[in-house]
Design a protein with these regions (language model features):
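Conserved C-terminal helix/tail region of periplasmic/extracytoplasmic solute-binding proteins
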Residues: 180, 204, 380-382, 396-450
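Conserved N-terminal structural module of periplasmic/extracytoplasmic solute-binding proteins
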Residues: 28-128, 186, 307, 321-324, ...
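Extracytoplasmic/periplasmic solute-binding protein
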Residues: 194-245
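Hinge/lid segment of periplasmic solute-binding proteins
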Residues: 124-171, 185, 194, 221, ...
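Glycine-centered hinge/linker elements that transmit conformational signals in sensory
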Residues: 242-273
């Protein structure tokens, strides 16, 4: 992945695009010069072609689309994705298969790859592209890839194997009424954040932070992203892959995890943080929950849970030590639509991917999900609920998250390094120092075993 180029593009798309109180996404193209010279009419023309550029075929086809995001699935149902595409391509039927979460999705893909039965459409995470590269069809020729700001930045050996759907930031979602009840202000530092949790907890009426720790993944804003934020290094996993003992006390990972441990020691997740999954606790945001840490993808769930949406506020996770420090926040490019190279419906799949990025459908979907556009010159206004975080921190530094290169993945597999599971263990009371000591030993051994 071309990290430097990606960071330059994201800076243009996020930092520059906070205009007149709204974050306008997709306002930068490949370079500033190109952005200046590309007219809106050209963009509309390009996007209008998005569902038409794949090799046309009138042969009947049924394509299977595996979806793991509940929020995406809800949006597809509301927008009638299958029916909308059927109007454009009457000969192609789309069948959506919903799986529980990203973990189940990845496991299912591994099993089906071995059986040569991958689904036609797969919304992969960035790191999965390398894992499945030998099974994926190049998408360089489709219009969706050509109008995408970041598709080529994630190309492998010159091949675009997945077209990214969106980019998004991470937030702490909170109930304004609860903050008002306890006379609380939005925290600006990590210690202030923990203090807010303690105040709410002491009141005895609400759970300070909803977690759903029975599922491992919901702790990702803390256990996965905070080391990158502490280091101001979105490629921290790659950096760590070049170090024998990256878990020592003077390293960013340990420093970040010490902060996380301080939060977990405050026990802000209720009496049994590992006793319920995310789907169980997310509905409590409308009643017993004061805060929840999640990405922009949580917007639909937040609106479902809270009757009065004006009561929903957002702020960036305040990982900094003092108010004078610059705040770092994670930016993720996500949802890489891919199709198997040995699939029976490659052309139909390409037409469907193009449709997903067609102007009318894509614009509506981005608004519905509260996500940021990655289509060149297509501006989608951010939802006002999310805009609150940007207004409160206009100088926030966007840290572009990289899921890790092949060397990191090799070491990760050898050491069974799993940050989300570590989060569960920390909540359960496992010693941080012992975890770090053990990881240093296994990490060093894994690096030496090349």
């Amino acid at each position: 992945m071309k990290t430097n180029g990606l960071k330059r593009h994201l800076s243009m798309a996020l930092a520059v695009c906070i205009v007149s109180g709204s974050l306008l996404a997709g306002c930068g193209s490949k370079t500033e010069k190109a952005a200046a010279s590309t007219t809106a009419s050209a963009a509309v023309s390009s996007q209008a072609q998005a569902s038409e550029s794949a090799e046309p075929s009138d042969e009947p086809a049924t394509i299977k689309y595996m979806v793991f995001s509940t929020e995406a699935n809800d949006a597809y149902t509301k927008m009638d994705l299958a029916g909308s595409f059927k109007k454009v391509k009457p000969n192609i039927t789309v069948e959506i298969e919903k799986v529980k979460d990203s973990g189940e999705f990845e496991n299912a893909l591994k099993i089906r790859k071995a059986a040569n039965e991958l689904p036609d459409i797969m919304p992969m995470k960035a790191y999965m592209l390398a894992d499945f590269k030998d099974a994926l069809a190049p998408l360089n020729d489709i219009e969706a890839a050509k109008i995408n700001m970041y598709a080529d930045e994630f190309a492998i050996d010159g091949n675009i194997l997945g077209v990214p759907e969106c980019m998004f930031n991470e937030f702490v979602w909170y109930k304004k009424s609860i903050f008002k009840e306890y006379n609380l202000q939005v925290p600006k530092t990590w210690d202030e954040f923990i203090s807010v949790c303690n105040t709410i907890k002491a009141g005895g009426k609400y759970i300070p932070i909803l977690m759903g720790g029975k599922d491992a993944w919901p702790d990702y804003p803390f256990n996965e992203y905070m080391p990158a934020l502490e280091a101001n290094d979105g490629a921290i996993w790659n950096t760590m892959a070049g170090i024998d003992e990256p878990f020592s006390k003077d390293k960013p990972f340990y420093i970040a995890y010490s902060k996380i441990q301080k939060l977990y020691d405050a026990k802000p997740f209720g009496s049994d943080p590992l006793g319920a999954g995310f789907d169980q606790v997310k509905t409590m945001f409308g009643s017993k929950g004061a805060m929840i840490a999640a990405g922009a993808w949580f917007l639909g769930d937040a609106k479902k849970a809270v009757a009065d949406t004006s009561d929903i506020g957002t702020f960036f996770l305040p990982v900094k030590n003092t108010t004078g420090d610059k705040l770092n926040t994670i930016t993720t490019v996500d949802g890489f639509f891919a199709t198997p190279k040995d699939g029976k419906n490659i052309e139909a799949s390409k037409e469907f991917i193009n449709f997903l990025f067609s102007k009318d459908f894509y614009s509506q979907y981005m608004k519905e999900r509260g996500l940021v556009s990655v289509v060149k010159d297509l501006k989608v206004e951010l939802d006002p609920i999310l805009q609150q975080a940007y207004d409160a921190e206009p100088d926030v530094n966007f840290v572009v998250y990289d899921g890790g290169n092949t060397e990191f993945q090799r070491i990760q597999a050898a050491t069974k390094f799993d940050v989300k599971k570590m989060g569960q263990e920390m909540m359960a009371g496992k010693s941080l120092d012992k975890m770090m000591e053990s990881l240093n030993k296994s990490w060093k051994a894994a690096r030496a075993s090349k």
